[in-house]
Amino acid sequence: MGCSGSKNASNPKDGAASKGGKDGKTTADRKVAWERIRCAIPRDKDAESKSRRIELFKQFDTNGTGKLGFREVLDGCYSILKLDEFTTHLPDIVQRAFDKAKDLGNKVKGVGEEDLVEFLEFRLMLCYIYDIFELTVIFDTMDKDGSLLLELHEFKEALPKLKEWGVDITDATTVFNEIDTNGSGVVTFDEFSCWAVTKKLQVSGDPDDEENGANEGDGANAGDGVPAAEGSA
């Protein structure tokens, strides 16, 4: 489920989503899983969500270092959040989220060598995963015929929904052609999701903005990013 490559345009629009789905999960599978997962990911900025994030970070941090490697994050997404109920492409999604959070954290802290995620970046990583999952649900509603591919008319019909999500489009045809990177005349989920996440970040800023980053830092020990006790957050 990477950011490049389209499904071969010769693949017929045959309603495959109702049978096996874009990644082995059906639309019904994802809908059921999403209702649980959207509540399980503590991405909001309120005190309760932050407290849940602290506990979740500790559960992910099996080595007790205050820093998460990719394997710890992936294992936690499987065993604790059980995100594989939604998709069979979880490693790819988590890798993207991990890299995004890590890179932003290194930029904020003025370092660029660590291949780790600390508590400061943890919320951003969760937000990115949430966004990809939410985009999958949106794509399911846009893909009216269940072909796993979007045509221009389906994209145009979904403009109000995309605006609600945070992406306002004025020239649908031009944007559709930009998303369709291989010129096949249809858009795959990979093309759509990579475009939508990037566009949302350009318009609204990273899901974990600078103000929130500072607040999250209050919940971590300076220097090592280990979550402090809940009362000190």
UniProtKB/Swiss-Prot annotation:
Q: Which domain of life is it from?
A: Eukaryota
List the record's Gene Ontology CC terms alphabetically.
Answer: cilium; cytoplasm; motile cilium
Residues that, per the record, bind Ca(2+) 1: D61, N63, T65, K67, E72
The UniProt record lists the keyword Metal-binding: yes
The UniProt regions of compositional bias labelled Polar residues, in chain numbering, are: 1-11
Query: What spans are recorded as compositionally biased (Basic and acidic residues)?
Result: 20-29
Q: Name one GO biological process term.
A: calcium ion transport
GO MF entries = calcium ion binding
Q: Which InterPro entries match?
A: Calflagin-bd, EF-hand-dom_pair, EF_Hand_1_Ca_BS, EF_hand_dom, FCABP_EF-hand
The UniProt record gives the binding positions of Ca(2+) 2 as: D143, D145, S147, E154
Q: List the disulfide bonds.
A: none
So what family is this one in?
Belongs to the calflagin family.
Record text about domains: This protein has four EF-hand domains, three of which may be functional calcium-binding sites.
Protein name, entry field: Flagellar calcium-binding protein TB-17
